Every structure is written in C-alpha cells, then in structure tokens.
C-alpha cells in the first residue's frame, strides 16, 4: 500500500525529472484528479502538465494516512514562485491511488 509521503515524493519526482513514470506506478488505471476548480482530470491529463510545467512541492504535513485514504497539506511553487498551500485528499484502492482531490489556497498578499 502506498503511503501519503511516498505519494507526495512521487509527485515531486515527476515534477523534478519531467517523467510521468512515478505517477503511472502509483495511480490506478481509472485514476481521477479533481483540482481546486472542480475540473476532473485523467492520468493522461495529469501526466501532461506534471511533466511540462515547472511545479515543485514541499513542506509535507500528513494529517491522516491509512489503507483506504490519506490527506494533508504541502507548499507549491510554479516557475519558482509561491502559489500557495495545497490541501490534498486521496482514496486508495488495490494498493494504489484512485482519486486525488486538491484545494489550493493562494499565498497571502502582504
């Protein structure tokens, strides 16, 4: 069973190497991602932007992680700029992730 920290590390590996393999190995064939705007994306959709955009994530805080689901928060940057904090929720199935839902909070303007 994949852990939340392993999943987040796989995301960062895909972002850092422009290689979708870490995502493909952790997501189910019927994987769905739902972004902050409610848009649903398939594995192919996610692999497209995850390997072409300059995203990075860090500051992982795992709130819950068991055999069925996980959730937590992480920081996110795009092109070196802070784009806020992301809250994620994932459903697990057959040892992999079948759903990844995010809600991003933009950085505060000071």
Which role fits each region the language model picked out?
Residues 1-21, 25, 29, 109:
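Short, low-complexity N-terminal intrinsically disordered segments enriched in polar/charged residues
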Residues 5-7, 34-36, 40-110:
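A beta-strand edge to alpha-helix "cap/lid" segment located at domain peripheries
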